[in-house]
UniProtKB/Swiss-Prot annotation:
Source superkingdom: Eukaryota
Pfam hit, one: PAP2
Disordered as annotated region, ranges: 1-82
Class in the EC hierarchy, top level: hydrolase
EC number per UniProt: 3.1.3.-, 3.6.1.-, 3.6.1.68
Organism: Danio rerio
Cleaved signal peptide residues: none
Protein name per the record: Polyisoprenoid diphosphate/phosphate phosphohydrolase PLPP6
One of the record's GO cellular component terms: membrane
Annotated gene: plpp6
Amino acid sequence: MPSPKARSGSGRSGSVPCPGGNGRYEFISLNRTPPSPVPPQLLQRQGSDPTTARLRASESPVRRRGSGSSNSSTGGGGQQLPEEDCMRLNPSFFGIALSSLLAIDLWLSKRLGVCACEDSSWGSVRPLMKLIEVSGHGIPWLAGAAYCLYKSDSPAGQEVMLNLLMALVLDVVLVGVLKAVVRRRRPAHNRMDMFATFSVDSYSFPSGHATRAAMCARFLLNHLVLAAPLRVLVLLWATIVGFSRVLLGRHNVTDVAFGFFMGYWQYNLVEMLWLSPVMLQSAIGQLH
């Protein structure tokens, strides 16, 4: 018989004594699931001791095979989730490259925004940068082209000024549509003290000043007879206008770079849509 200590221990641990086949007591925990019944043929083969038969049954190949299949099925089902997670968490090479480029763009734009406010490292140059900003604004260019068209006496001058006016209107429309589609916010260090802004000017991609500077520079160099120093001055002006957008914190570097690219190809579109005096007269005649 078990000692009183064994009984007290079994009572505390939540076990119940059960007589075995050899006359000894076994303690079965109530917290565990009862073992599966032993096949009667196995009992007959191994003798009358149920403990020995139960141990032999647990080591039988059938039981091992069943447990292995259940583990493999569980493991196979669990492996699907990591594969799906890997598909979600592993972006493509293009996504990684784009994220890296944007991170470099934001870092470089913040480092170059040295005139973003008066307290910046180059804050004393900010008034000059704002003057360059006005020189590339759309309103002075539209007003200047319309005035030159009105004052021009020669048909050739009127043709050039008319197409310049058309190019400026086309630039404003294309940049406004693209800004409304992309909707990229301006840099966080930008101060909204810009000259004559509209609703789409709260977005930064692409830079309208950069597109206008690149397009107007190509237009002037191809349709005006300028001396070599003036041609260099036009190119220098277009470059400074684009660079000033980053110094003032108005745009990121990629906004200006794409703006130059877009303005360069906008000029090709203007050449395709060029309005000659003959085409203009025929259009006016059709309207009348």
